[in-house]
Amino acid sequence: MTDVTTPPGPTTALRAEPQGGWRRILGWAMWDWGSQPFNTVITTFVFAVYLTSESFGSTNTTSTALAVSTAVSGLLVALLAPVLGQNSDRSGKGVRNLRLQTWLLAALSAALFFVKPEPGYLVLGLVLLGAGSIVSEIASVNYNASIEQVASPRNVGRVSGFGWGMGYLGGILVLLLLYFLFIQPEVGLFGVSDEGAIDIRVSMLVCGLWILLFTLPTFAVLRDAPKEPGPRVGVVASYKLVWASLRRLWGQSRHTVYFLGASALFRDGLAGVFAFGAVLAAGTFELTAGEVIIFGAVANIVAGIATMLFGLLDDVLGPKRVILISLVSLVAIGMAIFVLHDGGKMVFWTLGLTMTAFVGPAQAASRSFLARVIPEGQGGEIFGLYATTGRVVSFLSPAAFGLFIWIVSLVTGQDNTQYWGILGIALVLAAGLAVLVPVKTPQAQVGSQAG
């Protein structure tokens, strides 16, 4: 059973035959595993929380500063991703660029060690964190495009799912190691304590080392194919070329452009599930701080395993069906959590963990969808547009979450309306689902050159 398809589209970069065995695929997926500490430890659970603590000023001041920094870095990613991706395509140096960006990400992560718990270090922390976010996103563009070197149309779903699942598992493993070895004990490994926040700062050094070491297998299996580099072009000309490529893609494979729009919507909803899950856990379902961390750990394990399993279905059912199944399930479970919000912790543990099982599969299937249809030689550029479209609408989930809470609180005069934010996230997911339904899977022609 496969997705309903449109007439044949442009030649895809994927080759007809698999590009090596599972050892090669594992090497590729180690980038997901190795780079994940930046997302899990630095931007979500540890450093961002540290940076918004009272050590750096009032909570309102630090939280606002972090929000502004995040917005600026997101805007820069939206502007730079397609152009830098196009540059990788034109130069044929996508793997080289990925290697340099990964090393820079490791250095920026380790440099967070120098952010001491004093107000004067807030700007340094924001600059390093923002720069790391930009580098991480741009590196992901080149990494996603490199899937053509290890996958074929027959296994791209399970390869993408395996990589995404490795990211979940690697991120949560390093988080747990750091928590139990350095952060939780009064005196941790090597005598590390919380004096001067040295436990947090040493954790940043470990993250940098983790990124550097565990991504090495990726660069052992990926190679830049010999290619005559295209002529150098200026910044303005680069954006003109991106626009010309988008128009050409619109003419050749219009439903791929539709998919970029649909995925931008539902990917923002998927991000909202994890972004506001911890907020709801503590505020509505009254989980303690320790319970939230435990829930986050279990949720990432569930998401990682589920993503790998759904990758197998991707190659059988097609990526669009996997995404549809995931989105329908997420909306339904979200509505159930809303209705049963008075049920306490058991409701959140049961339905919340079930919900996380469908987030990763939708993300991984989105990557495999594009990998199947991207025209040959345009992987970096199209995955750059994929990053850009996601950034353009990244305000929707936070806005919908907050708007539902604010309106209901205003109408009812009650303060305990946080759970209404669940409907905001469900609405964004449902909007992405509605836009995705009419999208057809372009039947791209398979490339014939060796990978």
PLM region spans:
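Juxtamembrane intracellular "pre-TM" segments in multi-pass secondary transporters
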Residues: 9-26, 223-261
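Multi-pass alpha-helical transporter architecture, strongest
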Residues: 210-221, 423-451
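Helix-to-loop junctions at the C-terminal end of transmembrane segments
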Residues: 79-93, 306-319, 405
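C-terminal ends and interior cores of transmembrane alpha-helices
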Residues: 102-119, 328-342
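A membrane-interface helix-boundary motif in multi-pass transporters
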Residues: 59-61, 182-209, 403-429
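Cytoplasmic membrane-interface "Motif A"-like loop-to-helix N-cap segments
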Residues: 88-103, 315-329
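Short amphipathic helix-loop junctions that connect adjacent transmembrane helices
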Residues: 42-63, 275-292
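C-terminal transmembrane helical hairpin of 12-TM major facilitator-type secondary transporters
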Residues: 320-364
